[in-house]
Amino acid sequence: MQAQLPLLPITEATHDVLIELIYSSADNFTGRAIYEHSLCFLHPQAEACLRKAVAAARELDLRLKVLDAFRPQEAQEALWAVAPLPGYVADPAKGSNHTRGVAIDLTLVAADGQVLDMGTPVDTMTAESHHFYAGHCAAVQINRARLLTVMLEAGFLHHPQEWWHYQLPDANKFPLIDSHAFMTCVAQDKTSPATRAV
């Protein structure tokens, strides 16, 4: 009997989101692609909350753009090697909530396709990226508040220092996912929407 996958695939077609994983290209703070693929996964509980967030955003005539979700341990190690900054980058020795599949990085997109101005790019590791940084203009603060409202209503918690990062409550109680074993299961799972991309 085939084991059930510990994470669920997130796709634009199945979840009505936009997906642009920032670590699948060199356009991130490391200057190189960290992922070998562009597959997006979440823990089932986080996936259920994401669906609620999608519905909440739709009521505001907005869409969610997913920038990162499940992150393999080796990817976390690569990020830490470049920026060992607790509070912004999780120490891989302790484990990232992304590696548990219960954290997601994302932003909002307007009906015209424009990404809302959040004041800083993702992975800006300064005070300006903090959720309630007072130095941003009113429009930026409103946009961040919209994202916060959508995600809190869906059951996520925010990261005080990263406006883009949300995670399940008690996230660190979830087990870390063995990425090699997981991706092997994905490749073998003929029913997974992600299988064709592996």
Residues covered by each model-derived region:
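Extracytoplasmic cell-surface/polysaccharide-interacting catalytic and binding patches
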Residues: 1-69, 81-198
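Segments that shape or occlude catalytic/ligand-binding pockets
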Residues: 72
